[in-house]
Amino acid sequence: AASGTAAQGGGDLVIYSPNSEGLLNATIPLFEEKYGVNVELIQAGTGELVKRIQSEKNDPYADVLFGGSWSLMYTNEDLWEPYVSANDANVIDAYKNKCGFITGNVLDGSVLIVNTDLIGDIKIEGYEDLLNPALKGKIATADPANSSSAFAHLTNMLLAMGGYEDDKAWQYVHDLFENVDGKICESSSGVYKGVADGEYVVGLSYEDPCAQLVLDGAPVKIVYM
């Protein structure tokens, strides 16, 4: 984000982030230790954070948006200051900062997270399986307009079903959300936490927090998309 407190010469850095607790806990303390900076971390979904940055455009509070949807960043180009990391030259070409204001920091795949205590004999191996009537009202997803992980799933399923311009692909999206039955989680974290807690059978999520739940012994498994 443009010109927050640290940019004005203070010793604090304000970071807005939709990233998982695991990633933030692994990076923020080490960053503070290495650079002697005190971080004020504000966590919310990508859409909520971008809206906040929009409202603060004339008096920015945040210094950095750490994580989120590239599409939302591209469509709000006026919110960001130009920045290209000195390490960009070491990044493989496909992931270099070519726009001048987005620095990629992680490759994190889309996954389905499945509650192994609830799934029974229902097959879940891909997007088509989510149309099973037995899963109606038992599928967790966030709003693609506000969640970067939900938006990633939307683009993935459209491509998997025929492409962005394909009527059958959009019909799949319609049918899926009919099966979701109006149960839209407020954030990405609500998806994987809801599945792990047994509120949902399956959720459309992303690798990092779901893998951590598996490592922590939660009754879940991951299906990579």
Predicted regions and their residues:
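Short, low-complexity disordered leader/linker segments with a strong preference
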Residues: 1-13
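A ligand-binding cleft/hinge motif common to bilobed small-molecule-binding domains
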Residues: 71-76, 196-220
